Design a protein with these regions (language model features):
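Basic, polyanion-binding surface patches
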Residues: 1-135
């Protein structure tokens, strides 16, 4: 079909096509990573994405990480800045990179984590990281 021609290259700050919102494209991404600390990149599940929001009048991005994932939490705890990269199936370059300055971290229950992303497990405890989106 002709669908293949609408491949979107948003990595170079190009705007995604109007038909698909950024949230839809994020949901459609095949994987996501967080780069924190000394450029250490770790793969996190898409369930960690909590979406964009507003806090203190700033645009923020929410991440929820299972407390059992000690590596990811340790890196996030040690970092003031981090970036979240989203990849499409079969692509080694991210189509979207969100640069964040960490504002706060708080513990959330599994139920709260599920509200942010239905893929999370209601029985677990999570850390929620709030990062100001740096343009």
């Amino acid at each position: 079909g002709a669908e293949g021609n609408t491949e979107i290259k948003a990595a170079n700050n190009a705007t995604p096509s109007k038909e698909q919102s950024i949230d839809d494209q994020i949901k459609a991404s095949s994987r996501m990573t967080i780069t924190a600390g000394n450029d250490e990149q770790f793969e996190i599940g898409k369930e960690c994405w909590g979406g964009f929001g507003q806090l203190f009048g700033k645009e923020v991005a929410f991440c929820v990480i299972d407390q059992a994932k000690s590596m990811g939490n340790m890196l996030m705890d040690q970092s003031d800045n981090y970036k979240i990269s989203f990849y499409k199936q079969g692509n080694s370059e991210p189509w979207l990179i969100v640069n964040c300055k960490k504002l706060m971290k708080q513990t959330v229950t599994g139920e709260e984590a599920k509200k942010m992303n239905p893929s999370n497990d209601g029985q677990k405890a999570y850390n929620m990281y709030v990062g100001e989106v740096i343009k």
